[in-house]
Design a protein with these regions (language model features):
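Thiamine diphosphate
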Residues: 1-110
Length: 110
């Protein structure tokens, strides 16, 4: 059976991340204001689901999903500010993959 895990940050996650990292944090049209309740959507299709809001609930929710004999949707709420790495920048090749967030550079005044 299929198990689905939605990493739900309430945004178009990779689009928001690109805008943050490559477009000077100019966010445009990335917040999902009308996103449906994923758990209720799963039930509408006839299978079980659960929403997790706290990291402390994740292990038990994953175990519940694995133990379910049929399909299962786990909707995990995550911070909209968490980024996902590795990623390939716009127009970049695989050998230009970004493996971690850019580190701030200290600039000293002369």
């Amino acid at each position: 059976p299929v198990k689905i895990v939605v990493m739900n940050n309430g945004h178009l996650g990779m689009v928001r991340q690109w805008q943050e990292l490559f477009y000077n944090n100019r966010l445009c049209s990335v917040e999902l204001e009308g996103f449906p309740d994923a758990e209720l959507l799963a039930r509408a299709y006839g299978f079980k689901g659960r929403t997790v809001d706290k990291p402390s609930e994740l292990a038990s929710a994953l175990q519940e999903a694995v133990n379910e004999p049929g399909p299962y949707l786990l909707n995990v709420k995550v911070s909209p500010f968490d980024n996902v790495f590795p990623m390939v920048p716009a127009g970049g090749a695989l050998n230009e993959m970004v493996l971690s967030p850019p580190q701030p550079v200290e600039v000293s005044a002369k």
